[in-house]
Amino acid sequence: MYKRQLKSYNGSFDDGTAYYEFTQRLGYALLLKTDYAAAVQSVCCAVPGCAHDTDACPAYFPGRAGRYTVVAAGDTVYVWHISFFYDDQSWDDYWAEKLASGVRDREPFDTLTDAEFEAEYRGIWTEQSTPPCLYAVDPAAGKTRTDLPLTYRDYTMDACDGSTLYGEGVTIPYRTQVSPGRIGPTPACRIDLATGQAETFVLEPTEHYLAGFDGALLTCRYVADAPLPTDAEQYAAAIQSATVEIDRLDPRTGARTGLTERPYSNADYENNGCFIGVYNGKAYFEEREIIPGSGFRRTVLTTVDAAGRAETVWDPWPQAEWVLGDDGGRYIWLYRDNYNTSYAACALLDTETGQITPVTQALQTGSGAVSLRGKAHDGRWLVVIGADSAGRTTAYGLIDADQFAAGSTDWQPVAMWQG
């Protein structure tokens, strides 16, 4: 089972039986679990009498929640520590630097007590001074940590096949480089979850992961008649005639199958062939038309399946502001892109019939439409049904996907952790 992190913006993970996410506390993050069968959210800890506020707690992770990514594989939960900001500075030097910076007198820290302010930054320092590592979480007994060499700080962890994490080196897109030299093979890595053993390998030049796909990985790379030059100006000219090759790559064997080729586009700002996501077993791509001085408009939506069969879904794009969002299985959640400033769920696209159904269900508390967080193996969705004034989730509900698509609000409320 390959799965790219659906909610990579907050490190959460949905394995079909539960939804795992982090919640931020003062100086640390707690790992929460929403069990679909029980409809209960709880701290991922079963230690009797645990207060969940020290490192002895299996669910406790120092610093900021955004520095961690969780993945559930089998009966074990793993947490990858993202260490882009690793620093070996001593606590005394770090603390003196923060006190001298004046941050203590600025929002939101000006409302904290001295003890709270120190606790916040001690947690951040603890996280930043921790090397790249993999935690194995046992809710009943604690967590074990396997440290990796510092070179792994430069890798993102993008996919998991149930036993191994796969990542790739973080590189700035070549078009933004001042100096050349990023045209060579893309560094990649794999980490065995059971042992923590890690090794590196390389992808093709310019290649990078897009998503888990058909039991393997979907990748993207530029293909040209001649090797792309390293000079920035020559590269910018040569890339115009390149094609974007989309492949199915099995990183365990190196077997590669070409699925489709797409023409290079100056509107491909993400350098991914205008890839949107994998939905219901197919890879989705959009075509774009540049609007001089004001970005681009989406024009055509196409798919390709594991056999390389292509299909046009939309031509033209039905609503200019619509973007494809969360994967609901048969249904794709469509969101309204308010000029890249905010997103709101607006409709569901049925991948089997092509029918588009407006999302009419509103939050019970807070404003706006409900949104998807996970999907259970039994066909139910975990949806946000309540939020506070700051947009933080306060309530979840579980509901059958087809019933939701029919407009139902007959969801089963989740008993939320009251921490």
Task: Outline where the language-model segments fall.
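Hydrophobic, aliphatic-enriched repeat segments that assemble into extended interaction scaffolds
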Residues: F22, T34-C44, F61-D87, D158-E168, ...
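Long, low-complexity, intrinsically disordered N-terminal extensions of eukaryotic proteins, enriched
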Residues: K3-G27, E286, G295, Y331-W333
